[in-house]
């Protein structure tokens, strides 16, 4: 089963480009609000790193979600899209002074602190402004997620966060730093997680830490468990919206919050992944010695995930209904890794056919590069192409 696309409109546009189905996006956001809304103390932030397209950000902001940012540029993009600054959280292992100052100037909700030196610098910069920064400590829980090695973030060997062993020392430090206020704990174990058992393991580790803090008569304002919920790359038409019911229910069941504590989430891929497709044109169909190649005008510069993570994206020939043939689908970049899929069965391809690379709404347009001096792909919403 293929997706439904405004092919006639596509033919008027220069390829490659990203296409965002805002109906899918809005249905996804509605489901998030419905399921998270079952629990009074759940707050959801959108992980801007997944897709910072201004039109996409604006729709997400209109839904009421907050913003999870990992750079000063993302903070600016969120503010430009209208996100309230008191719903912006800021994480990242390498926050620079200007980025910290930007967050301080806008009085963002919280800095998720990842090291002792960072905590000291935030205190110093806040003091210079006569402000007190709200901080949560990103704790590395040493929980392994069942996902690609390059997108696990919660193991002791990863660069992210403060070790559980150092948590007490860092908390004690806040008592000596008058311009930071310790308000929360932050976690994030990885991305594209489909096994709810990984989130249960995180809940158990958070519960352990909460008990340790409670023994010291410390109860933080909020717990932030990050995001990580994956999407169904194999069946974007059958399962466009992730199972948010099970996701939020898992945390409600297994995480032991204290009275008045709020639970924060940072969802990215699960919000935008299925609403986006990369649309590309077939330049040539080339017969090799043992295989056929469908050579597209899109390459790894436009969608790097297959080359970087060996990620699968469903590929559809959206302008052909001819019998199936088998192709290696490749791009024009001067790299052997510029391959979107090998031995893919597709409707017979001809020069000028349009291919859709599905489930590309997350970590697609945002990760595009100008390698080979190529132009960056544009992004269009379904509302623009009516």
Region roles according to the model:
Residues 57, 80, 100-105, 122-125, ...:
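Short acidic, glycine/serine/threonine-rich loops at helix termini
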Residues 3-4, 250, 260-386:
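Charged (often Lys/Glu-rich) extended helix/loop segments that serve as interaction or gating elements
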Residues 1-133, 172, 176-181, 211-218, ...:
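A charged N-terminal "starter" segment
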Residues 47, 134-140, 186-188, 224-226, ...:
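Short beta-strand segments
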Residues 45, 134, 222, 262, ...:
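Hydrophobic "anchor" residues on beta-strands that sit immediately upstream
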Residues 142-284, 346, 372:
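Active-site loop/helix belt of alpha/beta enzymes
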Residues 21-24, 28, 32, 52, ...:
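General structural feature for long, well-ordered alpha-helical segments within catalytic domains
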Residues 24, 51, 74, 95, ...:
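Short, glycine-/Ser/Thr-/acidic-enriched flexible segments
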């Amino acid at each position: 089963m293929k997706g439904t696309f405004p092919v006639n409109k596509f033919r008027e546009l220069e390829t490659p480009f990203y296409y965002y189905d805002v109906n899918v996006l809005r249905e996804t956001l509605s489901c998030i609000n419905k399921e998270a809304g079952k629990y009074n103390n759940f707050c959801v932030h959108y992980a801007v790193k997944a897709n910072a397209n201004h039109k996409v950000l604006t729709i997400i902001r209109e839904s009421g979600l907050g913003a999870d940012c990992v750079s000063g540029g993302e903070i600016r993009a969120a503010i430009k899209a209208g996100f309230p600054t008191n719903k912006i959280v800021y994480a990242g292992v390498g926050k620079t002074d200007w980025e910290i100052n930007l967050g301080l100037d806008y009085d963002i909700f919280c800095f998720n602190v990842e090291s002792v030196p960072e905590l000291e610098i935030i205190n110093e910069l806040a003091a210079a402004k006569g402000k007190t920064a709200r901080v949560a400590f990103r704790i590395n829980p040493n929980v392994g997620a069942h996902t690609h090695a390059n997108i696990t973030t919660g193991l002791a060997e990863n660069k992210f966060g403060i070790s559980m062993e150092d948590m007490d020392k860092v908390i004690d430090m806040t008592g000596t730093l008058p311009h930071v206020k310790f308000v929360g704990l932050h976690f994030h174990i990885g991305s594209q997680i489909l096994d709810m058992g990984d989130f249960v393991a995180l809940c158990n580790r958070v519960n352990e830490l909460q008990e340790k803090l409670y023994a010291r008569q410390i109860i933080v304002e909020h717990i932030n468990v990050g995001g990580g919920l994956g999407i169904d790359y194999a069946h974007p038409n059958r399962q466009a919206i992730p199972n948010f019911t099970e996701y939020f229910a898992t945390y409600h069941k297994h995480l032991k919050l204290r009275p008045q504590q709020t639970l924060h989430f940072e969802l990215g891929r699960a919000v935008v992944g299925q609403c986006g497709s990369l649309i590309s044109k077939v330049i040539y169909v080339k017969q090799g010695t043992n295989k056929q190649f469908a050579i597209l005008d899109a390459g790894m510069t436009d969608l790097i995930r297959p080359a970087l993570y060996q990620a699968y994206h469903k590929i559809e020939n959206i302008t052909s209904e001819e019998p199936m043939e088998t192709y290696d689908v490749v791009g024009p970049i001067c790299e052997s890794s510029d391959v979107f899929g090998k031995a893919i069965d597709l409707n017979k391809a001809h020069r000028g056919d349009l291919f859709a690379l599905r489930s590309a709404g997350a970590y697609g347009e945002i990760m595009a590069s100008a390698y080979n001096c190529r132009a960056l792909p544009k992004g269009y919403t379904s509302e623009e192409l009516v």
